[in-house]
Amino acid sequence: MSLKEKTQSLFANAFGYPATHTIQAPGRVNLIGEHTDYNDGFVLPCAIDYQTVISCAPRDDRKVRVMAADYENQLDEFSLNAPIVAHENYQWANYVRGVVKHLQLRNNSFGGVDMVISGNVPQGAGLSSSASLEVAVGTVLQQLYHLPLDGAQIALNGQEAENQFVGCNCGIMDQLISALGKKDHSLLIDCRSLGTKAVSMPKGVAVVIINSNFKRTLVGSEYNTRREQCETGARFFQQPALRDVTIEEFNAVAHELDPIVAKRVRHILTENARTVEAASALEQGDLKRMGELMAESHASMRDDFEITVPQIDTLVEIVKAVIGDKGGVRMTGGGFGGCIVALIPEELVPAVQQAVAEQYEAKIGIKETFYVCKPSQGAGQC
């Protein structure tokens, strides 16, 4: 049963009438451009065919009822007439409440709604299950009540809800790609202007995500440290962000910087350049060059930004040994565990899967999870 069929059937059973709309919003993977977002730089994600699906209908009062199919059909209910506050017990409900509250704060006028939510974006894998939920809820209200919001505004509203209501500091990339993703394309995003450019993906190439299943522990504290080091670097160059520093300017004075800060800055500057070049390589179908750029990105994250772990490096090496120069592989996400992403010719996917199955657990003692994805369409009706 598809997520659409599941949520529609649950909706009818729970609320006693059929849903009028079914909306989806996808998760995402970032192909290249790591830790560049908060430096006002470039990222190159694509939406994936794992999504959050919501069957819904407008109500003629001011009540919101939400059922979470993936959490034992837990039901949350609140009124649009009262101040929206956090739910004491259901963390999932706070993503919904936060999005609704922030849409209200943006002076949008809408009535009540019934929703049933289900999703298959793996949680805790760094594939943006929370952003896909936020964008799906925003799109539900936009569609049901014809709100004058475009995808970028729905994305910004989701980011605001996550930062201010849920209390998790995130950049804009995850929500933006979920809202604006395009089938068979990745999206080059300028994190300063929020300008986007759709980049066609080469035919016959699979987007493979492999979760190391190594639980990230340092990610919060180390993420903040990296952010501070980047800000220190930008101040040294008297610029608002590292986006504004050229590699030539850096090379001329690198020796004057604290050595650790210098390494962090070098990663950001080279990663930004790689990301822009990667968009061109993909557009030209140059998988060999894309693979080189992904390898350079991984080495930079490992040696200059120091955010990889042995489990991740091992996974990358296993995949690289199979694909050679026929594709690319690197760590993706915040670091210290999580996932790797690979662009692989479809005919090589079984060999990669077999090599990883035979070698990773034997070397590391943890079983990986393997996802084969297609670059998918952003949020909308399904």
From Swiss-Prot:
GO terms for biological process: galactose metabolic process. ATP binds at residues 124-130. Substrate binds at residues 34-37, 223. Mg(2+) binds at residues 130, 162. It is an enzyme of class 2 (transferase). Keywords: ATP-binding, Carbohydrate metabolism, Cytoplasm, Galactose metabolism, Kinase, Magnesium, Metal-binding, Nucleotide-binding, Transferase. Pathway: Carbohydrate metabolism; galactose metabolism. The record marks 28 as: Transition state stabilizer. GO terms for cellular component: cytosol. GO terms for molecular function: ATP binding; galactokinase activity; magnesium ion binding. Its EC number is 2.7.1.6. Transmembrane segments: none annotated. Pfam families: GalKase_gal_bdg, GHMP_kinases_C, GHMP_kinases_N. It catalyses: alpha-D-galactose + ATP = alpha-D-galactose 1-phosphate + ADP + H(+). Catalyzes the transfer of the gamma-phosphate of ATP to D-galactose to form alpha-D-galactose-1-phosphate (Gal-1-P). This is Galactokinase. It comes from Shigella boydii serotype 18 (strain CDC 3083-94 / BS512). The lineage of its organism: Bacteria, Pseudomonadati, Pseudomonadota, Gammaproteobacteria, Enterobacterales.
